[in-house]
Design a protein with these regions (language model features):
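Catalytic machinery of carbohydrate-active enzymes
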Residues: 1-313
Length: 313
């Protein structure tokens, strides 16, 4: 699976396997899943093995035919007895066999089309382990790190500490700065607030960040873009509520148990609604959202504020 969001979504299913066999498990993930940075406190995961595949130029150690052999050779060293493959790829099935893993559990082969990311995983775990799994991921975090973060950032719960996840992996997911700024105007009229701004280093993400910082609210803002993900997590855990684009921060925030308003502009609604901690907002005039909805300009700051009030009160 590709990124942070996918990694968070699959956590309950990984944990179900661990609990079924009463041992921690190893996971094979891509580096951009950032699993090493946010799963270090997860007691059901023993080892994080990095899948070295480069989708752009196919130059990774595990790319191509030779890469498949390399991966099989790498996995063989661990002497795994079982493998659970959360996709329908024949390639991974063959790799598991070459690695001499006897117990191969996998989605139905060649059945990727229109595959529901959550339902497919639920059905898989039910079929293989007879376990009903709730899609409600939880990310474990060290309490000491949370306390240190609270001290370092002088976080005071007499004011409302709000995470604003203003970044996003693609331009159609990034809600314009004016919408966040208008929300900030509304919320500061009623509440005493601090805003923690989470984003990446992409040029367009930085533009949105600096447009927000170049407002009357700049003294109420703390930018988190120079921190590593593992440094950001304790800050998020100290927040009272989050408002995030459909991005890694919406998944991480909800996984940390923070009620998260997810601004859904251009991806299927399930990515912003699979957790009980998620409260999706869709563009004005739409009854749902999916790929190519292209609705980022139609996210209404008044609707965000209304949802904020419902949650916070």
């Amino acid at each position: 699976r590709m990124g942070i969001g996918d990694m968070v979504i699959f956590l309950p299913f990984i944990e179900a396997i661990s609990k079924s066999f009463k041992i921690p498990v190893s996971i094979l993930v891509k580096e951009n899943s950032k699993a090493i940075q946010f799963l270090r406190e997860n007691k059901t995961i023993n080892q994080i093995i990095i899948l070295d595949r480069n989708n752009k130029n196919k130059s990774g150690r595990h790319d191509g035919i030779i890469g498949a052999y390399n991966l099989a050779k790498d996995l063989k060293k661990y002497n795994f007895n079982k493998i659970f493959i959360f996709n329908s790829s024949f390639r991974f099935n063959l790799i598991a066999k070459i690695a001499r893993i006897k117990g191969i559990h996998q989605y139905p082969l060649f059945n990727k089309k229109n595959q529901h990311i959550i339902d497919a995983a639920k059905n898989f775990i039910k079929k293989e382990l007879n376990i009903e799994t709730e899609s409600n991921p939880q990310i474990a975090i060290n309490d000491k790190l949370v306390k240190n973060s609270k001290f370092n950032y002088k976080i005071n719960h007499e004011e409302v500490n709000i995470l604003l996840g203003v970044g996003g992996s693609g331009p159609t997911k990034r809600i314009p700065s004016k919408i966040f700024i208008n929300f900030m105007k509304l919320v500061t009229q009623k509440y005493k607030c601090r805003f923690f701004l989470a984003t990446g280093k992409d040029v367009e993400e930085q533009k949105i960040l600096h447009e927000i910082l170049n407002t009357q609210y700049k003294d109420k803002c703390i930018a988190l873009d120079d921190l590593s993900l593992s440094e950001i997590l304790p800050v998020i855990k100290n927040c009272d509520i989050s408002i995030c684009n459909d991005s890694s921060f919406s998944h991480l925030s909800s996984g940390l148990g923070i009620k998260t308003i997810v601004l859904m502009a251009d991806t299927p609604l399930l990515y912003g609604s699979y957790s009980t901690k998620m409260f999706p907002i869709i563009p004005d005039g739409e009854i749902t959202v999916k790929h190519n909805t292209l609705g980022k300009e139609k996210i209404n700051p008044n609707t965000i504020f209304e949802q904020f009030n419902k949650i916070f009160n």
